[in-house]
Amino acid sequence: MIIFTATLIIILAYFLGSISGSILICKTLHFKDPRQHGSKNPGTTNILRIINYKIAIFVLLFDSLKGAVPIWLGTYFHIDPIYLYIIAISACIGHIYPIYFQFYGGKGVATAFGALTAISINFFIIIIITWILTVYLFRYASLGSIVTFIVITFYVWYIQYHHFEYIILLSLIILSQHKNNIKRLWNHQEKHIWNR
């Protein structure tokens, strides 16, 4: 029964993750389509650049909840922790490859943030401190995300966090979505967080 419940939540997490906060909010409020403007990435940073910080905050909260809600649901049904990590991965894959938007989505950072925060407050603290500090020092949102998930990877490996391999897999998925950002950072072509 637990395995059946976990499987249903894993599937639900993908479909929930596929709902794009930026596209939905922009359509509802009649703002420009983030897929057609700026970096053309339907994520929080692009919304910050092409619209404003208030809408970006709503998108961040929406996309974070997509990761958190399935985890909370799994916790409510007392499923094994290993399934919680699979649920987190499923939600992020839904965000990155959304079935509702021709499998073209964001990078999964906010959704991963929500999922990991729902799993442990320690992840919340690490992510917030690392991201804010990195962006404050270097002014690149993408670098903040890259450094954050590298730190998460080493953290769970170093302390041998239970089922840490799933969290490392999640981090690698997020990092793989930043390959173009890494190239631009290397070539000094990446835009600062506030640059349009």
Swiss-Prot record:
According to its UniProt entry, this protein's organism is Blochmanniella floridana
What interactions and quaternary structure are annotated?
A: Probably interacts with PlsX.
Name the record gives this protein: Glycerol-3-phosphate acyltransferase
List the gene name: plsY
Q: What does this protein do?
A: Catalyzes the transfer of an acyl group from acyl-phosphate (acyl-PO(4)) to glycerol-3-phosphate (G3P) to form lysophosphatidic acid (LPA). This enzyme utilizes acyl-phosphate as fatty acyl donor, but not acyl-CoA or acyl-ACP.
Catalytic reactions of this protein: an acyl phosphate + sn-glycerol 3-phosphate = a 1-acyl-sn-glycero-3-phosphate + phosphate
- State the pathway, as annotated in the record: Lipid metabolism; phospholipid metabolism
Protein topology in the membrane: Multi-pass membrane protein
| Primary site of residence | membrane
PANTHER family from the xrefs?
A: GLYCEROL-3-PHOSPHATE ACYLTRANSFERASE-RELATED, INNER MEMBRANE PROTEIN YGIH
